[in-house]
Amino acid sequence: IKTPSTEDALSWLSEFTEEEAKMSLSLTDNCPILAKEYLRTNTIQTREDFINDISGIIKSGKDIVTISKKWIEDLDTLPMKVEWMVKILYDTIKFHADDSLQKLTEDTDNISRYLSQNTHIEKVHNLLAQTYATWTQFSSDSNLNKEYQLNSLFIDWEKLLGISKKV
């Protein structure tokens, strides 16, 4: 099945603001059914909160324990947030490989670009593997302690990205 044009998708999402519709289409790779679900379930606000949290961790070493507890309180969105972390790292690798790229994921490009310029790429690759492994555990609904796993992941981000040295 062919993905509809952006105009058709925006028309289908006309009950929402154009800005919201474009953002949700961007987050869902132009999949209007999923975009509508994102808009109905307030996933856009979850995304904004995620960006604030993750950029705080990356740029200023924001309290990872507090953020971890906050994320654990909403287990339904946890796999999605970790998937978004994976996407940031993918984009970081792409920006590092080709600095002429203008745009990948509009709302997190600044984070990915920052990481591509301030972190050794080997560390990003290692962190990507660890983040993806954590996402797999959360997505498969394993019986491992999710709070422990998330804290461990945030500590890996801190260590491998050198955040604590910047604070």
Protein language model regions, located:
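Charged, glycine-rich active-site and insertion segments that engage polyanionic ligands
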Residues: 1-84, 88-167
